[in-house]
Amino acid sequence: MAAVIAKSSVSAAVARPARSSVRPMAALKPAVKAAPVAAPAQANQMMVWTPVNNKMFETFSYLPPLSDEQIAAQVDYIVANGWIPCLEFAESDKAYVSNESAIRFGSVSCLYYDNRYWTMWKLPMFGCRDPMQVLREIVACTKAFPDAYVRLVAFDNQKQVQIMGFLVQRPKSARDWQPANKRSV
């Protein structure tokens, strides 16, 4: 009996429009035009990032090595923002995270805060307002350690974080990276 009552109340609650009140809309236009679909990539156009001899450092690692003019532009940007430049260097075998070059309590990690310490060139350049002073220190460091990685990092003393870091010298003897045009196979 309850099933019959439930069935009749459901059918009463559903309103069915009369056939004559439903009209097809023949002239509907889309509100937004669909973006054209790009042709799918061919299998021979897809590249694979090679993990062998393709190690990266910091901010601009995906780019080809920076020229002197590009490094000078980055130094200008660091100084103009009031950040504190600091030079660091490391031999090739100490530049990457490994059991021999890092002090850690967990597994291997990446980025600056991984307990992988490079040797600091002098002190951070607190209060430096002259980009030429930073460039002179870069030249002095690269002359003193011609076969070492040299990176410039910038710190924000208000936020107390590293803002950026990039290589200014890669050793000529380094064989652990690929030029940008050979990073994929």
Curated annotation (Swiss-Prot):
The modification N-methylmethionine is found at residue 46. Keywords: Calvin cycle, Carbon dioxide fixation, Chloroplast, Methylation, Photorespiration, Photosynthesis, Plastid, Transit peptide. InterPro entries: RuBisCO_ssu (IPR024681), RuBisCO_ssu_dom (IPR000894), RuBisCO_ssu_sf (IPR036385). CDD domains: RuBisCO_small (cd03527). Pfam families: RuBisCO_small. GO terms for molecular function: ribulose-bisphosphate carboxylase activity. It is found in: Plastid, Chloroplast; Plastid, Chloroplast stroma. Residues 1-45 form a transit peptide. The basic functional RuBisCO is composed of a large chain homodimer in a 'head-to-tail' conformation. In form I RuBisCO this homodimer is arranged in a barrel-like tetramer with the small subunits forming a tetrameric 'cap' on each end of the 'barrel'. Heterohexadecamer of 8 large and 8 small subunits. RuBisCO catalyzes two reactions: the carboxylation of D-ribulose 1,5-bisphosphate, the primary event in carbon dioxide fixation, as well as the oxidative fragmentation of the pentose substrate. Both reactions occur simultaneously and in competition at the same active site. Although the small subunit is not catalytic it is essential for maximal activity. Belongs to the RuBisCO small chain family. This is Ribulose bisphosphate carboxylase small subunit, chloroplastic 2.
